[in-house]
Amino acid sequence: MQSLTFRLLEVFQSIVDHGSITAASSALSLSQPTVSLQLKKLSGIVGMPLFEQTYGQLKMTEAGEAVYQCAQEVLGSQSRLESQVHALKGVEIGTLKLAVVTTAKYVVPPILSPFCKQHPNIEVRFIVGNRADIIDRMRHNRDDVYIFSQPPQDDNLVCTPFMQNKLVVIAPPDYDGPDNCDLKALMDHKFLLREYGSGTRRAIQDYCDSKGLVFPNSMIIESNEAIRLAVTSGLGLAILSEHTLAHTPPDSVKVLKVKGFPLVNHWQAVTVKHRQISLAAQAFQKALLNVE
């Protein structure tokens, strides 16, 4: 593969990371025909198709998966070398690829703001997705650091807790039902719940299983904001992270006093053991550990 270049790998990685040739061309400031030509050239060098169309979406072939892994290793090594050389010169640069579950989008920006001011030459790529999406990105080793409240159980992961995550029971502002009670006393009400698989839902389910509780009347809503607005409008009760309420009007919902609540777990920074951690990622992990 004598014709293989950093640029070809960079273009291919961008297509995978952004999900399409159009999005990659925009990210790389290249024309779509140029990106398509680079992809065709790389496919020719490999001698096999790198993508296939599945329901109108690009999906990597087995050969594409191998090339993507190679691209990550090669370009990651190049980036680390650049960072280390600049560090020796006293100049801090690099890229931090950060992927977080949806609820963590309320937690991470206040940490990123001072971090970016302290490290102005570090480029941050901030991805927000549901738990399944972030786990998929982690399995494909696409990012440096992942933020979960309920990380998957995997011996290949390093999980570092850095901040409490408190789940509270909320009700409409005009709620006049049971309060100062246990969760069982509220089970006659409709509960608005996150989807199965979300970190919030898993924490709630674990608690209910330990108490032998089942929600007889519930509605699944795949958005914290939508749940909060639905509670405000009187659709039902919910259990959400306190962080989702931080920037809402104080009278938009009522936080109930429920025995055993708030449920407390921790936000965790997760890295993959075999992935070499960039200097930028190391700096961010240090910033997380200094969060009060």
Describe the residue ranges of each PLM region:
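Secondary-structure junction motif
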Residues: 181, 189-211, 277-281, 285
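Alpha-helical linker/hinge and terminal dimerization helices associated
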Residues: 43-46, 67-89
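Short helix-boundary/capping micro-motifs
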Residues: 13-31
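Central regulatory/effector-binding core of bacterial HTH transcription factors
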Residues: 93-154
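Flexible hinge/capping segments at coil-to-helix
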Residues: 89-90, 157-191, 195
